[in-house]
Regions:
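Generic N-terminal leader/processing signal
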Residues: 1, 45, 63-66
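Alpha-helical residues within the helix-turn-helix
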Residues: 39, 50, 56-57
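Short amphipathic alpha-helical/adjacent loop interface patches that line ligand
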Residues: 41, 52, 103
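A cross-family signal for key residues in well-ordered alpha-helices
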Residues: 14, 23-26, 56, 62, ...
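Beta-hairpin "wing" of winged helix-turn-helix
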Residues: 57-66, 73-75
Length: 131
C-alpha cells in the first residue's frame, strides 16, 4: 500500500514562483525528455535538473527513466484547489509571449531530424519501446 503524501501548499506556491519552473511547466504538454528542456531553455542541464527536482518534490511533475534519458510530465496535485490553480496557471502561460516563444522553439527542436539523430534523443511525448 502506497503512503499518501501530505499536500504542502507553501511548497506548491513556491514551485510556481520561479520563472524557470514556470517555463518548464509550460513545455510539458505530454512527456518530454530533459534533453529538450535544456535545449529550448538554453540553460545548463544541472540547473534544469535542480528545478525539475523541485517541481517533483512539490508534486507538480512526475518522471521516469528510459536508458540514459529522463522523461518528465505534469502530475496533477492531489489537492483539488491546487489542481485548479495549476490548470489556470497553464492556461495563463499559454497567453504569455515568452512562453509561446519557448513552445515554438520546442517544436523546432523536437522536429529537427539532425538534432534527434545526433543526440539519439527520443521525440517528446512518444514512448520508445526497447526490444
Amino acid at each position: 500500500m502506497q503512503k499518501q503524501r501530505h499536500f504542502d501548499m507553501a511548497r506548491f506556491f513556491q514551485a510556481l514562483a520561479d520563472r524557470t519552473r514556470l517555463r518548464l511547466l509550460n513545455l510539458m504538454r505530454g512527456e518530454i525528455c530533459v534533453c529538450y528542456l535544456v535545449e529550448v531553455l538554453g540553460e545548463p542541464q544541472p540547473k534544469i535538473s535542480r528545478h525539475l527536482a523541485y517541481l517533483r518534490g512539490a508534486g507538480l511533475v512526475a518522471a521516469r527513466r528510459e536508458g540514459k534519458w529522463m522523461h518528465y510530465r505534469l502530475a496533477a496535485p492531489q489537492d483539488a484547489g491546487a489542481a485548479a490553480i495549476l490548470r489556470q496557471t497553464l492556461r495563463t502561460l499559454e497567453q504569455d509571449k515568452a512562453m509561446q516563444a519557448d513552445r515554438a522553439r520546442l517544436e523546432r527542436v523536437c522536429c529537427a531530424p539532425q538534432l534527434v539523430e545526433l543526440q539519439g534523443a527520443p521525440v517528446p511525448g512518444k514512448r520508445i519501446v526497447s526490444s
